[in-house]
């Protein structure tokens, strides 16, 4: 079938994480035999990275069309309603170009509530089935913002099917919107796979993610101080960039761990995979997650995980592949760090990687998505015939 996947964008050298979730699923679906076209428009203020008009990318059997005219911040000056109409117009413009180049889609597949909200205009105007997948962390909270509540109420009811990436998020959609959703987990990308552990002199911890408060990296210096491991025996690499970079570096320095905890900045997936295969333990200290792709990438390489109990983490971490600790509990995190350090040989890296591939490989996820798409198309075909 032909799938038009509505995405934030396609990962680029300057921003390797932008649109990476969507790209992974697009490549998995293409590998499974579908024609996949990623549709996106860019409203960010990135003049030096963007050319005006359409940009086309074809890679790994996935076609991508991006449209850039004007940063949304300027359109926002005219009010929220005008901004919304502008964004819907841009998406329709990209859709028409995609139809011109690749033919009519069998199904529309949108990621994140904000993009799904705009995808509704395509469904209504062009009479195409629409499947929405949700992995926005704003939904997975006890209380959500009024604007998010309104957007969700105005959007999900138009979906022919809704998917979430974790059972915890599935429960939230029912709680906040009364929506029954399928669960299809995130993908462990093909860049991440088991290799024989290339151990270096020091026991190496690793973490990846944006340097923002939600990711909980500020807990790490405190936890390592409490764990009190021999300083000449370990190191911690944190991969990622963000607004908390300087605060985190200051906390590392003031804890006396400048020579142990290293902020490596942004890396592409191949570089992250190499660093994972050189590491002994992955740490996810997040305060809020849905279903962490970073954890799946570590597991795919066979790296045992220490993770906070949030979102769908219990759906992928068990006693054979890691340890869990309560959110924001520095003492429990320190204890998990010590336990993992002292019991490093208790985890079978090859078995961890094999289990991850069996549950979260691109083929497994593409098969699950295809089943949902086929159900939607068959149901709509039956309605139209009757």
PLM ranges: what are they?
Residues 287:
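Aromatic "clamp/platform" in nucleotide-sugar-dependent glycosyltransferases that forms part
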Residues 1-57, 374, 380:
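N-terminal subdomain of nucleotide-sugar transferases
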Residues 198-215, 221-224, 237:
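Conserved donor-binding/catalytic core segment of Leloir-type glycosyltransferases
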Residues 168, 187:
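Carbohydrate-associated surface elements
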Residues 319, 323-330, 339-344:
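Conserved acidic donor-binding segment of nucleotide-sugar-dependent glycosyltransferases
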Residues 304-307:
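Short hydrophobic beta-strand element within catalytic cores of glycosyltransferases
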